[in-house]
Design a protein with these regions (language model features):
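Short, Lys/Arg-enriched N-terminal segments with co-localized hydrophobic residues
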Residues: 1-12
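Hydrophobic alpha-helical transmembrane segments of small proteolipidic membrane proteins, enriched
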Residues: 11-138
Length: 138
């Protein structure tokens, strides 16, 4: 049952995005996308840790909010840095080829925008978690 459900979910995602999420992840550059994923996982870890500490130690729970914010901001910064490095490498390829074909430019821009998009997603998740935790803590 799990396999069938997972397969249907992946087909739905594939139909919406045109590619699987893993393919988009690799297309955005494995290094920066992996670093941003680590930031997302850290944000989730600190969010869960803060939720578990709310009842026992509210002060520690409030201090953890800074870690959630920092990991989300780092994910966003890494995404922007990945975009700039991707654009620089795309411009190097254009310079070496001598021809600015629209398909090459469009492909380079698409790849360059994937890492900041994932970084923005990480940042948004962390800010949403902080907002919810602040509401719960009051």
């Amino acid at each position: 049952i799990y396999y069938i459900l997972n397969e249907k979910i992946m087909k739905l995602i594939t139909a919406i995005l045109g590619l699987t999420l893993f393919d988009r992840f690799l297309e955005g550059g494995a290094l920066f996308m992996s670093l941003i994923l680590i930031c997302l996982l850290m944000s989730i870890f600190f969010t869960v840790k803060s939720i578990l500490k709310i009842k026992t130690d509210k002060e520690v729970s409030k201090k953890i909010l800074k870690h959630i914010s920092d990991s989300g901001t780092l994910g966003l910064a890494l995404g922007v840095m990945g975009a700039f490095l991707g654009l620089i490498s795309a411009f190097d390829v254009l310079e070496a080829s001598g021809a600015a074909e629209p398909a090459i430019i469009a492909g380079g821009l698409k790849v360059a925008l994937l890492s900041p998009l994932f970084g923005l997603f990480t940042f948004s998740v962390s800010k949403l978690a902080i907002l919810i935790l602040r509401i719960i803590q009051k």
